[in-house]
Curated annotation (Swiss-Prot):
UniProt protein name: ATP-dependent helicase Lhr-Core
EC number: 5.6.2.4
Boundaries of every Helicase ATP-binding domain copy: 43-234
Entry's free-text remark on domains: Composed of 2 helicase domains, a winged-helix (WH) domain, and Lhr-specific domain 4.
SMART domains xrefs: DEXDc (SM00487), HELICc (SM00490)
Alphabetically ordered keywords of this record: ATP-binding, DNA damage, DNA repair, DNA-binding, Helicase, Hydrolase, Isomerase, Nucleotide-binding
Assigned protein family: Belongs to the Lhr helicase family. Lhr-Core subfamily.
GO MF annotations in UniProt: ATP binding; ATP hydrolysis activity; catalytic activity, acting on DNA; DNA binding; helicase activity
Length: 841
């Protein structure tokens, strides 16, 4: 196993200048005067051939830390007339926009170094820089073959294609440095895909790996992910060098009784005031629709130079906005998630987060966009929308200040990505099975890959399922494998990558089209679920291909709000801290809370009142107590499980519990889930007894979640994604794009067969849903925690304050914002009446 350790030595300017060639040293002295912290730790170590992961804030000279040792080597070769026509430095970024940035940011210093060299009488050969992505034309690729760049900038997908390009791959064999930027954005299947590409590249080239990351935890795991198994990695962590200021500012004192229009008015007035106090402000919302809404209202208030930036806008528009931001021509820019990553956007004075960013690392990435230089303070303001949001943001801001960051999740042993790379490898040469297995296991996400899973994927690729029109891509014989047929290369080129084709799903009622929903929303549906579309309420009956069947229902409350798919989930570590905070608030006075959490008196009071109300009405569920509450409505019974585990883990537990209860009570059980718990909703003639609750806590969670998944839309959708990644279903064939409708239809034809034979791609679909979507590991961890707590099962006259959002959010599509406020106010009045009655007894 390779060693992972933190670098302790910070080199002086003189020590770094010693290793730099004269033109580079002279240029650096003129332009920068002195090295920044990440440069002091990293440059010399990279020069000495060490793999390095650099974690430092935006504007700290991180990119130059990564490139300078390599550029210095290229200048040295150029001075010695030894610079060959091949690629020396490979830079990989998940963002195409970032690639264009880097190209610009490299060409400028290289030109300046030439000018300095000329001045001091040194002639240099030109160091070429080029970008190769899906936007690169055939003629540009041809030019690269004739005159290769010395520095190549690319994306994970384009690297996978380049590895299999017979001529171009030869140019990769001399690579000395590989730089992976924004590695924190690659802790997903795209990153898993890249980790295998790097191992395949390592077979033909011996290179140093350099990773660049924003604040992420744990860095030791990211380091292993960067370098793979058996290699050393050294971590430069200077994220603490940047001063950060985070404040939680509430637009109103009272979220319950202040009318919506008033909250809205005060919110936009607050935003206007903050914008006017700063030169450039960046506002993050949590949904794309909110982005446009905020921009509209700010313009109405007379705020000038307002722009939006999100993934639904055209690339041209986004680039134009980035350019304007850089030039300081925008007063305020509103974004959803698209500006979280490191595209250079110049100087931002203030970052405002509307609503909770749901994780400390996301908050730090967003707020880190302000105070672009290392010595400047990053300034962020979080504006909560309700009482739960207020509590969450106070805990989040505190965790951010003390540097407590939520853990990342890197998918493991993804069999669909493995299948794709095995096809790519078969195109390179004939492989010995064990040699290929050992190469795959060097990639960190595959270190524990079983030989059985590996052979199952090879056998699938060699056997195909011809009766289902899935043809073999490789041959496998005598412990060796290679490519099969001429069309395999084209299939690989046209279908490589991990990002599935997304589409809208048609909604059909009584044979008629009534609208469409996002696929991400459709995959959450289970039979009997109720949702709202175009102001009408529908019950989900089932789905086939790219259509879902529904029937219109009346007097039924929705179980899934329409915005569910756009919501960010609460990080598990932060959720656990919220539980501890609840207990702390109950046992502290207002002054103690105010001081420790650096909040104003009215915020501390609002939080204290919220906890007291809950405590007087029921109990406060925290890290020692579990609350399960039951209350009845006219037609149904609600059972609310106050589990603070984040929405993904809660959905796993809710599915497991609902599956079990529906079997023993022989009825349909609906669920409604949020970050703070879930509701099981039963018909009025069914009841969950205390004995049933005891049984729930002895449940086989995984078995029940799997049973639930097998009945829901998510399995069909995710199987298509996995099957396209694993080349069982093609997205493009013979220069033709295959529609998502067709892909989905093919997936459903294959799903039954794959389930029957326990196919590796079926197993991968279940793994992806359980581990990557539903966060099963944390769900099981939480399940064990609550078993050790004191459990309170209370029958209540109406929902407790902590349950308001869960009860109302399910209905928030049928009711307008104003009615939602009224509904919460009504529930609150009932709570206060009950408390006062209790007080009189």
């Amino acid at each position: 196993m390779g060693r992972v350790e933190y670098l302790k030595k910070e080199y002086s300017d003189e020590e770094i200048y010693e290793i730099l060639e004269k033109p580079v040293k002279e240029w650096f002295k003129r332009k920068y005067k002195t090295f920044t912290p990440p440069q002091r730790y990293a440059i010399k170590e990279i020069h000495e051939g060490k793999n390095v992961l650099i974690c430092s804030p935006t504007g700290s000279g991180k990119t130059l830390s990564a490139f300078l040792a390599g550029i210095n080597e290229l200048i040295k070769l150029s001075m010695e007339n030894k610079l060959e026509d091949r690629i020396y430095i490979l830079y990989v970024s998940p963002l195409r926009a970032l690639n264009n940035d880097i190209e610009r940011n490299l060409k400028e210093p290289l030109k300046e170094i030439y000018d300095v060299a000329k001045e001091i009488g040194i002639e240099l050969d030109e160091i070429r820089v080029a970008v190769r992505t899906s936007d690169t034309t055939s003629s540009q690729k041809q030019r690269m073959l004739k005159k290769p760049p010395h520095i190549l900038i690319t994306t994970p997908e384009s690297l996978a294609i380049a590895l299999n390009s017979p001529k171009f791959s030869q140019l990769l064999s001399g690579i000395k440095y590989v730089i992976v930027d924004e590695i924190h954005a690659l802790t997903n299947k795209r990153g898993v895909h890249l980790s295998l590409s790097l191992e395949r590249l390592n077979r033909i080239a011996n290179f140093i790996r350099i990773g660049l990351s924003a604040t992420i935890h744990p860095l030791t795991e990211v380091a292993k992910f960067l370098v793979g198994n058996g290699r050393d990695c050294y971590i430069v962590d200077v994220s603490y060098k940047k001063e950060i200021e985070i404040k939680v500012i509430s637009p109103v004192d009272d979220f319950i009784y202040t009318p919506s229009e008033e909250i809205s008015k005060r919110l936009y007035n607050l935003l206007k005031k903050l914008i006017e106090e700063h030169k450039t402000t960046l506002i993050f919302t949590n949904t794309r629709s909110a982005t446009e809404r905020v921009a509209f209202y700010l313009k109405q208030l007379g705020v000038e130079k307002v722009e939006t930036h999100h993934s639904s806008l055209s690339r041209e528009h986004r680039l134009e906005v980035e350019e304007k931001l850089k030039k300081g021509e925008i007063r305020v820019c509103i974004s959803s998630t698209s500006l979280e990553l490191g595209v250079d956007i110049g100087s931002i004075d203030l970052v405002i987060l509307l609503g909770s960013p749901k994780s400390v690392s996301r908050a730090l990435q967003r707020i880190g966009r302000s105070g672009h230089r290392l010595h400047e303070k990053s300034k962020g303001i979080i504006i909560p929308f309700d009482r739960d949001d207020l509590v969450e943001n106070v805990v989040l801001a505190y965790d951010a200040k003390i540097g407590k960051i939520d853990r990342i999740h890197i998918p493991k042993n993804c069999l669909d990505v493995l299948a794709q790379h095995l096809v790519g490898m078969a195109l390179e040469k004939v492989w010995d099975v064990d040699e290929a297995y050992n190469l795959i296991k060097k990639a960190y996400p595959y270190k524990d890959l079983s030989k059985k899973d590996f052979l199952d994927v090879l056998n699938y690729l060699a056997g195909g399922i011809e009766e289902k029109n899935v043809y073999a891509k490789i041959w496998l014989k005598d412990n060796k494998f290679g490519k099969r047929g001429k069309s395999v290369r084209a299939i690989y080129y046209m279908n490589v990558g991990t990002i599935p084709d997304e589409t809208a799903v048609d909604v059909i009622a009584d044979g008629k089209y009534v609208g469409e929903v996002e696929e991400e929303f459709a995959e959450k549906l289970m039979k009997g679920d109720i949702f709202v579309l175009g102001g009408k309420t529908y019950k989900y009956l089932g789905g086939r291909g790219n259509k879902i069947r529904v029937k219109e229902v009346f007097d039924e409350k929705p179980t899934i709000p329409a915005w569910f798919s756009e919501q960010l989930p609460l990080a598990y570590d932060l959720a656990l801290d919220i539980e501890k905070f609840r207990k702390e608030v109950l046992s502290s006075d207002i002054e103690e809370i105010r001081e420790k959490y650096d909040i104003d008196e009215k915020t501390a009071k609002a939080i204290k009142n919220y906890m007291d109300e809950q405590n007087k009405f029921a109990i406060v569920p925290d890290d020692e107590k579990v609350l399960i509450e039951n209350f009845d409505e006219e037609k149904r019974r609600y059972y609310i499980f106050h589990f603070v585990a984040g929405r993904r883990a809660n959905e796993a537990l809710a599915r497991a519990f609902a599956n079990y209860i529906s079997k023993i009570k022989k009825c349909n059980v609906r669920i409604s889930v949020n970050d703070y718990g879930f509701a099981l909703i039963l018909p009025k003639n069914r009841k969950i007894k205390r004995a049933d609750i005891t049984e729930l806590f002895n449940l086989d969670v995984v078995k029940n979640v799997k049973e639930s998944i097998e009945r829901s839309e998510i399995l069909k959708r995710r199987f298509r994604h996995v099957a396209t990644r694993g080349f069982m279903i093609l997205r493009r064939y013979m220069n033709r794009k295959i529609s998502v409708d067709r892909q989905q239809f093919n997936a459903e034809m294959l799903l039954k067969y794959c389930k029957e034979v326990n196919h590796p791609l079926y197993r991968e679909t279940l793994r992806e849903i359980l581990e990557d979507s539903l966060d099963i590991d944390n769900a099981l961890d939480y399940f064990e925690k609550i078993k050790r707590r004191k459990i309170y099962y209370l029958e209540l006259p109406s929902p407790s304050p902590f349950a308001f959002n869960l009860v109302v959010s399910a209905s928030s599509d049928v009711i307008f914002m104003e009615d939602k406020k009224k509904m919460i106010a009504e529930l609150h009045k009932k709570v206060m009446e009950f408390i006062s009655m209790k007080g009189k007894k």
